[in-house]
């Protein structure tokens, strides 16, 4: 789509984006090094498959990220890339979110199962709603489970979670194997779903397809 993108892995001690995207073998520096004064370029790794997508791995140990250092870092990288995505771990600790700035969009990702939806509702209830444009991405979506009423329908998931829907990502073999293949085939349903989400983020009006086509 022609946009430069930076992915920042915030999951201290349990980083995974470098492995999922195939740059783990290159990693020498990570986010903690940058926050402690190293040049941003030292800890930034570009995907071989797309020169516009870059990743900064999370610190290898817990406790290296502070609100002050993250705030300064966030302000700087926002001027360097068209899109910056901070990938936070699951949980209700929002202490670092405010360091990124109130102009940030917030995306909660949940599966359609009842436990995950309830967790999303807890996140929504705890999030300072006045500060964030908050949306929901439903991951591992399976239309068959909805049809058979094993899981709640999409409207119920939205109502229970409390978030506005941004998009649906279907259960996909490509996504399951991402840590091995590091890519998603362009003609797959998963790729098309992620592309729809990206277009919406850029301000396009993109309708949700019929459920069985997701």
Locations of regions flagged by a protein language model:
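Short beta-strand "acidic-cap" motif of Rossmann-like dinucleotide-binding folds
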Residues: 4-9, 85
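P-loop/Walker-type NTP enzyme "switch/lid" segment
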Residues: 7-79, 173-181
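Conserved beta-strand segments of the P-loop GTPase G domain that flank and frequently precede/overlap
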Residues: 56-58, 87, 107-111, 136-140
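Inter-motif core of Ras-like GTPase G domains
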Residues: 79, 91-114
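G-domain G4 guanine-recognition motif of GTPases
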Residues: 111-112, 135-148, 168-175
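Conserved C-terminal guanine-recognition region of P-loop GTPase G domains, centered on the G4
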Residues: 118-131
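Beta-strand-loop-alpha "switch" segments that mediate conformational coupling across diverse proteins
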Residues: 156-186, 194
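NTP-binding/hydrolysis catalytic cores, primarily Walker-type P-loop NTPases
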Residues: 178-214
